[in-house]
Structures are given as C-alpha cells and as structure tokens.
Amino acid sequence: MSVSVHETRKSRSSTGSMNVTLFHKASHPDCVLAHLNTLRKHCMFTDVTLWAGDRAFPCHRAVLAASSRYFEAMFSHGLRESRDDTVNFQDNLHPEVLELLLDFAYSSRIAINEENAESLLEAGDMLQFHDVRDAAAEFLEKNLFPSNCLGMMLLSDAHQCRRLYEFSWRMCLVHFETVRQSEDFNSLSKDTLLDLISSDELETEDERVVFEAILQWVKHDLEPRKVHLPELLRSVRLALLPSDCLQEAVSSEALLMADERTKLIMDEALRCKTRILQNDGVVTSPCARPRKAGHTLLILGGQTFMCDKIYQVDHKAKEIIPKADLPSPRKEFSASAIGCKVYVTGGRGSENGVSKDVWVYDTVHEEWSKAAPMLIARFGHGSAELENCLYVVGGHTSLAGVFPASPSVSLKQVEKYDPGANKWMMVAPLRDGVSNAAVVSAKLKLFVFGGTSIHRDMVSKVQCYDPSENRWTIKAECPQPWRYTAAAVLGSQIFIMGGDTEFTAASAYRFDCETNQWTRIGDMTAKRMSCHALASGNKLYVVGGYFGTQRCKTLDCYDPTSDTWNCITTVPYSLIPTAFVSTWKHLPA
C-alpha cells in the first residue's frame, strides 16, 4: 500500500495569505525505478546496448549514469561510447555478473552468494558500483577461512577493500602454516611474501615453518627468484631455529651456499645462536628477535597501588602466577621490555619521594640489577622500546625546595637510554608536556596519545617522535580528550582503550599510524581507568584499571578479526596491576 503525505502551509503574498499543500508520496522513487525496469525489459525508450560475451543488454543511459560514476564519465566526457549506441565489454565481464549489476541499478536489490561474491566485488569495483563491491566484500568477510584467506587478501588489495584486506591479512598471519600450503602461496609477489614473513604478528611456534616456506617459494620458480633469497632470509628469525636444523641447512642446502650474501646471513645466524646458547648477554640481532606470539606476558602489581611483585600470565592454563619480588616497591612508575629484560623506571617509593632509579629484571636468569639512573626523577610518565633503546616521556617530577614533595607541572623532557652503553641522554622535548599519557612505538616512531597538560587539562593531541630527525610533530587529534588510557600496537594499527570519564572508560579506538585515521571498535566489557594493554600474536590483552569504586578483575582479550572482547581469566583479588609488558621467551636450543 502506498503512503502519501499532505501538508498544509500558509504563505503570505502581496494579495494576502493563501493555503499551499505539499504532497509527498514516499513510494514514488521505487515505483519509478520499477517502471523503468519494465521499460528496459520490453526494450522501450532504451538508448544504449551493453554487450558482455555473446549477450546484449538494452538499457537507459540516464539510469546507468545515475547508478555508476563509471558510466556517468563514459557518457558525458566525449568518449566514443557517448556517441555510439553500443558498449562492448567483450570477454572482460561475465554476462551473468553484468546482468546482476543491471538488475541492481534498476531495482536496488542484489542476491550475493558464495558463487558470485568474488565476481561481483571485481565487477563492482571495475564499473564503480561501489555499494555492490562493499556488500560483496562484507559477504566475503563472513566467509573467510584459513584455506581462502590468502586469495581474499590478494583480491581485496587489488580492489581497495580495506576492511576485507585487514581481516584477510590477520587470518594469513594467524594461520601461516595453512596459508603456505595453498595454491596462491607460490604465486605471491616477492613484496607480499616479504610483508608476511617480516611481520612480528606472524604466528608460528616453530620458525622452521617460515624458513621452509621461503625456500619453497624460491624453488617454485628458481631462476628469477633466487636473487630475492638474501632479502627474504633477513626476515626469518634464523637464530630461533633449532641448532641441528641451522647446521643442517648450512651444510646440505646448496641454495644457501650459492650466493655470498646468503653465506654471510647464515654465518651471522650461527654466531647469534652460539651467543644465545652461551648466555652471552642480550642478543639484539633481528635474526634472534622472537615474534610476538612467542612472547611472555608479565604483570607488575601488588596488593595496593604500591607495586611489589611480577606475575606471569600462563595462556594455556589461563592462570596468573607469581614470578618475582621487586627489590624496591613503588607506584606510578613505567615499565617496558627490551628483549628478555624488563626496565622499571622512576615512580614514587614508600616515602613518597620521586625516583630516578632504573631497575632491570632479567627473565632468563630471574634476577634484578640496577641500570644507570635517569637524568630527571619522574613519575606518571610513559615509556616504550624503539630500535633496542628505551625512551621515557613526560610525567611529573618533584618541585625543588618543597617539602613534603609536591608534583611539578607535566614535563616536556624526553630521555633515551642505550642498554649497550648503559647511558641516558636527552632528546627533543615534547611539543606539549603531558603526564598520564599512553606511549607506544610503531613503524620506527614514538606515539603519545592524550594525557594531562601543564594546565592540568585533558589533552586531545597525538604527538609523534621521529628519531631519524629528532623531532616531534602533531599527527592528529584524538576523537576526544584522553588521559589514563592504555595503548597497544598491531602492525601499523595502534589501539587505544579506557579513560577517566564516563564517555571514554569503556571505549576503544584504532589509529592507523600510516594514514592518521581513527576507527571506533567494539567497547570493552567493562569501564577501565588506568588499565594496561599489550599485543601478543594477533590479539590484544587488557588488564587492571578501575572506575569509581569498582576494580576491574579480569584479563580480557580483543580479537580484531571479529571485533569482539572476551574474558581470559580473573585476576587474583589481591593483585592491583600497575604495568603490563611482554618479553622474549627463553630461546630454543
């Protein structure tokens, strides 16, 4: 039943007032479109014929141009097709797919299924039926499997379907062992293969899977591909291969010894392996860097806000296990990991004094040591590892000559620590001093989100530090002013969650540090202020925090592929998390 609306209005003119009725029939557009479709099927008033294969489709130029920018440009910019009464796609377009697109143009409806989804995505992109392309991509997202995710990744990359690409990419990383057995794997470009195997988020319990995958790819088309082997080998964590596997590869794999560059790479891997087996200090070579799925998750916390213990998260048993005591209990410090070591910087001790101290926990030998103190005593600061160095950012220090100790305004000063030299140095200061900000490293840069300003206001800026230029820039504005948030990194995506207001406490966002664009993701399961987050494999983990008088007692996990949060385990009631870090696991023999 059609619905119409009559509105009576008064309009004043030179002759006085008069009544005007505005009539609106909501179903009119559908009726017109339906009748145009009837006219098309009877070839009435059609003025162009589209050909695909051996089939002809009479159409109306106006309907095509209104439905697709492709046809609008074709018919209005003086192209040959704007004058001809036929457009021939020949064999570039399947007739059944073109028929579906035309039915959509004349009805606004289309049936997408497993058999036509890929073809509709390709044709929708080619003919700029972007709504159809996006609908097909959404259908394919819901039908992603390890067996088809590589093909979907390549398809979505070719047709600018970013969301489908991200989901497919994540699934390729999670199921790499299955992906390498697919037909598409051996046809990958070198650059795409390199992107996959160089990712810290690639999930495999055995680096031999990656090593064997690149040899498989090179041997599939040996002559043109063997030149790429050195570059590919540099992205394999060769020092994480078992010793016997590494030795056997060097002695029996002729392909590895055929090029001087590959020989040097394998020699370096053997040297790193020897150092690892001899416990000869921290091995920071890229060939010895574990992927994130091979990291150990550690929580620093205590029974009060004064942290006095390290706990280890056992993924499989879903338990949180006490690991070691802190030599000097403290609060409002920051903690970051470099390799197998945890660096605890600054904070306030039991006497409320602000500390310059840096305590280092070696997870291999399970012992504490002191590193060189920071140049400025600080608390409420952030820290992050970048290129095997530690950066501490912002925070507060104590005001000189004030007793008892009183906090300063938010600091601009940023310090860099070199573990090899055991030395601190100042680098370029923040554009805006902040405390209680979220600090992470991604894509060889530091990012600082929000925080408390020198005027004690919440900050909404994203500050970015480029170490190659020793310079800070403002990259973007946050969706809202933030402080007491947590941040974690997956590839080029930085995830921000929590905060100290009713509107931010449960919210979570994704920031693309290559495009500087924000995306809202699913809310957390609870409101969290001062929570802590990190990435492991292709998932995010968040722990701790509170809101009002309610403490958050769960360790939750976020899966980006499904945009869902789930509880992993309950944090012991006596534990109040103060920091959350991931370190390298003990490296295999």
Swiss-Prot record:
The keyword Cell inner membrane does not apply. The keyword Metal-binding does not apply. Keywords: Kelch repeat, Repeat, Translation regulation, Ubl conjugation pathway. Residues 46-114 form the BTB domain. It comes from the Eukaryota. Transmembrane segments: none annotated. Pathway: Protein modification; protein ubiquitination. Residues 149-250 form the BACK domain. SMART domains: BACK, BTB, Kelch. One of its GO terms (biological process) is positive regulation of CD4-positive, CD25-positive, alpha-beta regulatory T cell differentiation. Component of the BCR(KLHL25) E3 ubiquitin ligase complex, at least composed of CUL3, KLHL25 and RBX1. This is Kelch-like protein 25. It comes from Homo sapiens (Human).
